[in-house]
Amino acid sequence: IRTFSVPGDVAFVNEFVRLAELMPPDGLIIDVRDNGGGLIWAGERLLQTLTPKTIEPERLQFINTALTDQLAKANGAGASIDLSKWRPSISRAGETGASFSCSFPITDPARCNDIGQRYHGPVVLITNARCYSTTDIFAAGFQDHDIGEVLGIDNNTGAGGANVWEHGLLLQLAGAPLKALPKNAGMRVAIRRTLRVGKQAGTELEDLGVVPDVEHKMTRRDLLENNVDLIEKAASILAGQPRFRLDATASKAGSKLRVKLTTQNIDRVDFEIDSRPQRSDDIADGSRNVDLPTGLAHGTLSLKGYK
């Protein structure tokens, strides 16, 4: 993934899903080296497609200053960028002495879990020190949710995991005392810092970055033969991970909904239609048909597998 700088997240995530579903089920290597970032929710929404776990997006917070207080007060509900969740804690800073506001996600948690897992094989993520911004956040979420091993060719990512705003946007949202820069100059600032979730909940991503689980020093063969040793290292990591499979096709059988399942290394499958539980089956590896009750042949079917 060379960039997360995309016009919108929907087409980006859909294309990732399309490509991931074409990949062999034995393992997937995702390479985000040199990815400078982009749209935060484009990165965070990808995570759900790689794991059965519920994704908790990373949280962000403002430093408490008179200007961020002004910014939050001027951009409440209905504004192009709604800062109402951050406003109370920023406003209390004079009383509490807190240096930073409370933290909240930018990406809607519901949107981080609205697609579900689409690739069921093991995954390894390759990073380097030139991963910044959304890529820092993506790598942190990958590690925080134990999706797979992070393989780094450096001992950290770029550690620039912050929400970056252009000066022009700040001028639009905050107004005075900011002024337009001379000679059409521009600049960007880190407006909100990111905090991690999971086992490292509350740890700053900015400056600390994402330390890889496994480090690989690039070799002469990597440089001359298209990363051959790096890929071999990633493949060896994948080879040690368990394989899971949950494939399903649905069709009507009279008034019933017939689901053909093919599973591997899964002990139980729960069936839901429009988020309503329908049944739970203990299963063995292989294929089988499951008929859901009469009258439930309409709606969105969701399957959840458990080990």
Region roles according to the model:
Residues I1-K307:
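C-terminal "post-core" interaction segments
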